[in-house]
């Protein structure tokens, strides 16, 4: 796919939990719990108008769902701030220091005073209905590992409550995650390829993690991706679970927008105007149906409504993403608005046990070939679903609607809600502006020195190749590498990195289990000059539970020979072998027992 020709633009929003002693706006510990909660409270969302009289469209959307929100908490780690029954405390200073440091890493412009804002959140994940957020800096740019990264904004905000389950119209959240400090880094739109965007996302995330001030583990980093193409629209894709999925998500969203534009062109060519809400009860057409799907609804007292979709024949079944059709988009809207599980459309019928005769009967009753079937018990819900479908159909001639979507595990996306408007942000009235003091700036400058480029250069200076240094930075082993570097000072840094990255991986492919204790034992033996680097792989391969590297070396006859003995061997071999073949011959005869550096040293001494 020619992304440049498509005019592909991609933006990232990287959210990273910070490792602090308290939550951002209260003094509760930032720990997640799996034990039985001590209490539950119930809330519902209500629309409130902003000071300018505006209402956010995403709020209207969510309130229409009539959902109930249940929040679980603990008496010893949940407070009234999280329940929105007490004003917020002043923000955590450690989180502020980290946010300012990250702003400095990306050369962003800092504000002298930080204002706490309320950002409307409509999915129930914040008890108050809003998320407290602070804009720390804007307009940053940094060149890191060869990538020119423009940063629009850096914000410090509270994380949302953790979704536990969904019970019909009730959503259950746990308050343990609510309020954990979160840094949000939003990039400028980029013209990079999807694979390059993945690299940029990793660079941003790791730039924060490398400071040691970010949480680690599953769920501590979340990526949102904004995608648009020429003629399309900005689509925000929430919750891409893994960096490796980013290229696929971007590719599939570009494909989706291309295909939605094709549908718009075809509708214009056909002269399709506005679709009106026109439904008919076609339950009688399925009185003797053999379709299990339909029969299940009818047996529970339900009915089948058919919605006319004139001019959409062959377009409802038009594939817009791998395995997803335009009809899938309509079904997403139905699922988002109502409790219905989806819909059936004429382009996929006959099918699902519905016969050609039943399809003809429905088409004859409606007087159109293109239609959608909605099945359920509640008439009001069926009519609401029909209205939602009509609204989406009437967006189709315009091309790509602006939406917030969720990433699926295969890289495709599904509709969540309309994109929020400008009315979603307003000032926090319970907190004064926060001043960035000289002390905060001074501490942030020290943290900012620990950056990705500096770490890369440091590894190169230790003798690692560029590839090995980059591989180490990208791996989860960097902290261990630095720990071992300090602990085993006689072991060459490149050998430590090679053991952690290459040798361990090669042995794992053979089915050999390698853990930290085995690696430490090998490094200790290397540090004490008991074994050679040539013997490392064989020793790790043959190490038994509870056995030390030295014990394995003695059992296998791989104990390192003393230098004086190596020198005698080199003298003996040099009398029988051509000069250029001496090193190879010694290493062949005494493989794993002699160190190549000892052989080179002995050869140099003999020659002199």
UniProtKB/Swiss-Prot annotation:
GO CC list: cytoplasm
Enzyme Commission number: 6.3.5.-
Cross-referenced PROSITE patterns: GATB
Listed InterPro entries: Asn/Gln-tRNA_amidoTrfase_suB/E, Asn/Gln-tRNA_Trfase_suB/E_cat, Asn/Gln_amidotransferase, Asn/Gln_tRNA_amidoTrase-B-like, GAD-like_sf, GAD_dom, GatB_C_1, GatE
Catalytic reaction list: L-glutamyl-tRNA(Gln) + L-glutamine + ATP + H2O = L-glutaminyl-tRNA(Gln) + L-glutamate + ADP + phosphate + H(+)
Pfam families reported for this sequence: GAD (PF02938), GatB_N (PF02934), GatB_Yqey (PF02637)
Key words of the record: ATP-binding, Ligase, Nucleotide-binding, Protein biosynthesis
Any GO molecular function: glutaminyl-tRNA synthase (glutamine-hydrolyzing) activity
Intrachain S-S bonds: none
One GO biological process term: glutaminyl-tRNAGln biosynthesis via transamidation
Family label: Belongs to the GatB/GatE family. GatE subfamily.
NCBIfam families: gatE_arch, PRK04028.1
Subunit structure: Heterodimer of GatD and GatE.
Chain's role: Allows the formation of correctly charged Gln-tRNA(Gln) through the transamidation of misacylated Glu-tRNA(Gln) in organisms which lack glutaminyl-tRNA synthetase. The reaction takes place in the presence of glutamine and ATP through an activated gamma-phospho-Glu-tRNA(Gln). The GatDE system is specific for glutamate and does not act on aspartate.
Name of this protein: Glutamyl-tRNA(Gln) amidotransferase subunit E
């Amino acid at each position: 796919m020619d992304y440049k020709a498509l005019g592909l633009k991609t933006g990232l929003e990287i959210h990273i939990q910070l490792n602090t002693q308290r939550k951002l706006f209260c003094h509760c510990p930032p720990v997640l719990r799996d034990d039985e909660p001590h209490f539950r409270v119930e809330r519902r969302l209500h629309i409130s108008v902003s000071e300018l009289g505006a209402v956010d469209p995403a709020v209207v959307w969510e309130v229409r769902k009539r959902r109930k929100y249940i929040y679980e908490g603990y008496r010893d780690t949940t407070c009234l701030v999280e329940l929105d029954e007490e004003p917020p405390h002043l923000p955590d200073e450690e989180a502020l220091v980290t946010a300012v440091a990250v702003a400095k890493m990306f050369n962003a412009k800092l504000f002298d005073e930080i204002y706490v804002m309320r950002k409307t959140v409509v999915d129930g994940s914040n008890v108050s209905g809003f998320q407290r957020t602070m804009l720390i800096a804007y307009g940053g740019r940094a060149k890191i590992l060869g990538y020119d990264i423009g940063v629009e904004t850096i914000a410090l905000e509270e994380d949302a409550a953790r979704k536990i389950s969904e019970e019909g119209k009730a959503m259950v959240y746990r308050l343990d995650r609510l309020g954990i400090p979160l840094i949000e880094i939003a990039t400028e739109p980029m013209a990079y390829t999807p694979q390059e965007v993945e690299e940029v996302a990793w660079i941003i995330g790791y730039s924060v993690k490398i400071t040691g001030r970010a949480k680690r583990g599953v769920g501590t980093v979340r990526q949102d991706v904004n995608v648009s193409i020429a003629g399309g629209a900005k689509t925000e894709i929430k919750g891409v679970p893994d960096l490796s999925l980013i290229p696929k998500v971007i590719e599939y969203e570009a494909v989706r927008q291309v295909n939605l534009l094709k549908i718009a062109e075809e509708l214009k060519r056909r002269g399709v105007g506005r679709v009106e809400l026109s439904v008919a009860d076609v339950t009688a057409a399925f009185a003797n149906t053999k379709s299990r799907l339909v029969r299940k609804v009818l047996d529970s007292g339900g009915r089948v409504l058919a919605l006319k979709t004139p001019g959409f024949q062959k377009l409802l079944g038009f594939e817009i993403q791998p395995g997803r059709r335009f009809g899938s988009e309509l079904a997403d809207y139905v699922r988002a608005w109502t409790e219905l599980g989806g819909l059936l459309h004429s382009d996929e019928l006959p099918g699902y046990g519905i016969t050609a005769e039943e399809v003809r009967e429905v088409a004859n009753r409606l007087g159109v070939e293109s239609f959608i079937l909605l099945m359920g018990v509640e008439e009001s819900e069926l009519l609401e679903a029909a209205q939602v479908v009509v609204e989406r159909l009437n967006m189709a001639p315009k091309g790509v609607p602006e939406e917030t979507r969720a990433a699926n595990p295969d890289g495709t996306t599904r509709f969540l809600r309309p994109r929020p408007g400008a009315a979603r942000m307003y000032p926090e009235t319970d907190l004064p502006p926060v001043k960035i003091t000289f002390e905060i700036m001074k501490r942030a400058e020290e943290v900012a020195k620990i950056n990705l480029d500096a770490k890369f250069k440091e590894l190169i200076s230790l003798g690692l190749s560029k590839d090995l240094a980059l591989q180490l930075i990208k791996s989860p082993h960097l902290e261990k590498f630095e720990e071992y570097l300090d602990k085993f000072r006689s072991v060459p840094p490149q050998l430590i990195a090679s053991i952690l990255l290459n040798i361990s991986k090669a042995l794992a492919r053979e089915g050999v289990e390698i853990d930290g204790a085995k690696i430490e034992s090998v490094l200790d033996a290397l540090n004490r000059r008991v074994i050679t680097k040539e013997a490392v792989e064989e020793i790790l391969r043959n190490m038994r539970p509870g056995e030390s590297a030295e014990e394995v070396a003695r059992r296998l006859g791989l104990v390192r020979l003393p230098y004086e003995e190596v020198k005698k061997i080199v003298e003996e071999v040099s009398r029988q072998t051509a000069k250029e073949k001496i090193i190879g011959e010694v290493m062949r005869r005494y493989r794993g027992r002699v160190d190549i550096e000892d052989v080179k040293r002995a050869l140099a001494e003999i020659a002199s």
